[in-house]
Amino acid sequence: LTITGADHGGGIFASGHADYLEISNNRIVNNYGTYGGGIRIGHPNLINPTVVAANDNQYGGYTNASNDFVRIHHNHIAQNGGGGEAGGGVALCTGSHNYQVSQNAICGNYTQGNGAGIGHLGRSNNGIIANNSVLFNQSFNQGLNVSGGGIYIGGQASLVPTTTPRPSPGTGNVTVSSNLIQGNQAGAGDGGGIRAEFVNGLDVRRTPGNPVPWYQLTVVNNMVVDNMAGMAGGGISLQDTVLANITNNTIANNDSTATAGAAFAPNSPNQSTPQPAGIVSRAHSTLLYNTIGAGSGYKFEFSNPTLLNNIVWHNRSFYWVIDAADPSSFGLWPDVSTNCTSTRCGPPVYRDLAVLGTSNPAHQLSPRYSLLTDLTGYGGANNITGDPLFIFEYTNGDQGQTIQQPELTTSIATAPAFDEGGNFLDVRFGPHSPTGNYHLNAGSPALATGTMQSGVPTTDYDGDTRPISSPDIGADERN
């Protein structure tokens, strides 16, 4: 079945009480929705008027739409558009418990909200996003900082009680497994590949000293490659995510362009501040940090994920500048193109892992048993460095390029609107067709140098079995 041409509710819209709904084997293309362009499950902002404000410690005042056990699989979801909130291709709103989004091709979708490919907004416990191809989706909004080019997982602000602010209801447990997340763009915010925010909140408030019932984000076996963020975290960005397990992923060749409005200091539109590009953790909100119990073992100022067996490689950091000697010349610095002739020429700058916004600039992430571009500046142990020897990798370049090896790069173009405020820069890059192969070649230093412990998946990106000891680092287990 082909569903196309919808102009308000998106291609498929399930409002409420749609337990066990199955959506499969469809072509859902060229639709528009105010909230969610391709497929939308539930409502993003439906308020429950019967809730007693002082007693709602679960949903924060939002209505549970009761769309449990929805299955969305084997669909072609492409070139849909969303007007706001979350989800250009697929939108999952509060009350979509135990959903599964799997084996879909989600490509070329757009949203002015968060999560151009897939958007999980609100509390929907035990969701699974697995084995999808999430390609070339874009989130952008000139007036708002919106995030998550490929996948967005986010809680909402509690509505009640209004007199005493509470943390977000959170998202519920979410697993993101074995997806290809490639070529997506969060042009006005964080997380070109994946953005997770407000995952935890009221769950922590209910048991501040006991983390066992808290919600957890699990990100395993994904290839997060060649994505781009206008702010930080071209690969993955986290905020208010207390429990996160990021294990056996390949996070490579993602870019941060520092072209979002928030990357510019006040009254300084001529040069932005460069941002880290691979995995970024932002400081917790004050409300959540004050809620976390001192005896819980998780009293950190920032999202401090478990980082195990990951390849985090060659994630590039740029910033935007106007040439002082020639104001008509502007663009990204450094210009890494092979035939560069501008004053902005230079080698790529790699910034793979970072913590932003805390009171202590020495705060750092702690990868373990991971392959990194550089071993300095991080906590953790048993990490290695060296070319991972992917079968075929590429880097982002000019929008018109077809395929480029990393050593034959072209420049990434920017399109400014100087008479506008907010996010006044749009970034144009390519290629825009599926390419590359981020499986491991023979001789890779990632082979048999990982560790098998709790939380490590027993199979890889392709479903191949991992050995019980010394698995490969990254999403691929070479067999």
Predicted ranges, named:
Residues 6-15, 33-63, 82-93, 111-122, ...:
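Extracellular beta-strand/beta-solenoid scaffold signature
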Residues 443-452, 470-479:
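Short, surface-exposed, low-complexity cationic segments
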Residues 10-20, 24-25, 441-446:
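Extracellular repeat-rich scaffold modules on cell surfaces
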Residues 215-443:
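Predominantly extracellular beta-rich ligand-binding scaffolds that present long acidic/polar faces
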Residues 1-5, 18-32, 46-81, 96-110, ...:
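Right-handed parallel beta-helix
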Residues 442, 454-469:
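Extracellular calcium-associated, cysteine-rich motifs in secreted modular proteins
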Residues 414-419, 466-474:
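Extracellular interaction modules
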